[in-house]
Amino acid sequence: MEAGHEVTVHAFDRLAEHPMSENHHGVRIMRYHLGKTPYGGTLRTYQGIRSFQRQVVRTLLHDPPALVYCHDADTLRVGVALQQQRSVPFVFDMHDLQHTWVRYQAPQSRLRAAVAGRMKRRMLNRAKHARVVVTSSGGISPTSRGFSEWLAHHGIESHVVENRPEPPFPSRPSTESVGWTVGFVGRVRDRKAIDLLIKTVDSIQPHERPTIRIAGDGVAAASVRRHLMERVEAGELEAEVTGAFAQAELPDLLAEIDVMFAMYSPLRGNILQGALPVKMFDAAAYGVPSVVNQGCLMAEVALAEGIGCPAEWNDLTSVAKALFQARSMSVRLETTADRERRRWRKALLPVLDSLQ
């Protein structure tokens, strides 16, 4: 928009709960209601996404835009279709390795491995047609690589633009409180991560245990809520669980916690391949340290910027130690969305100039 272009967002409203057409600060949002479609890696999810892709392609072929911006791999089909049929260039913004989700529930499954492999090959083949590729992480040392290095390994050049919050950030209120709270704020998709948090809290001496605070929706949200409420009713731990929240509510949620739990099961391949959890940056922006996975890029970033502590996955002693260590930290996020905006403009400038 800053370059004088009109922007329309084509969004899949999976639960059909928002207006189908809306204008948000000059950006037109078109939402597609195609029946309720669950999140996750189910057949219904795949069918819903395919239906969304076909609808968007039909819409854009009727009135082609000057540029298509593909937000993650499940929209690449749209970009390639417009390029092949109308010579419209597209940008690929990759902030996840979508194919890794297929194997998450059953990593030993040969069928899931075959499906994941096919998705990976298809994504890479389509990505090679993009005018520009933007991705959300890049290595900061030879030790742990990010998505940019993963793409380079497959012959695709990319520009790193991390997903960091927008300043200014309010000061964290200083309050006198009894006890402390560990939070998991965001999409609740990884039940294994929540189970690790619960087991770790169980392993801590009762008089030192933190309260658990969960906020967010996702495929595992309902089961997590049921399990935690059963534990609370049995008097075994203290916890509070709430569902989806608006971005405007995030500061108040972060003000409730002392440490952010940002660990994920390594069975999700993208953790070891360079994913950077947005919740780690969001928490640091409000003065909250995070506990993250050891032995990968997120640990290097957390240590380099002084915004968190790494812990070994499934090692209760290591996780508990990191929670206590993080609790005593004072953090401040120095690198924000300001830097990422400059990176994004530099990456997109050639393609935007070509549209003039």
Predicted feature residues:
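N-terminal strand-loop element at the rim of the active site
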Residues: 3-47, 147-152, 160, 218-219
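Membrane-proximal helix-turn-helix segments that form the acceptor-binding/catalytic region
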Residues: 54-61, 77, 81-85, 98-99, ...
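Conserved donor-binding/catalytic core segment of Leloir-type glycosyltransferases
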Residues: 134, 165-167, 174-192, 197-202, ...
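Carbohydrate-associated surface elements
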Residues: 139, 164
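A charged, aromatic-enriched C-terminal amphipathic alpha-helix characteristic of glycosyltransferases
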Residues: 168, 313-320, 327-356
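Glycosyltransferase donor-sugar binding loop
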Residues: 185, 211-225
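Nucleotide-sugar-dependent
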Residues: 192, 246-253, 260-281, 292-300
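Nucleotide-activated donor-binding/catalytic signature segment of Leloir-type glycosyltransferases, i.e.
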Residues: 224-254, 259
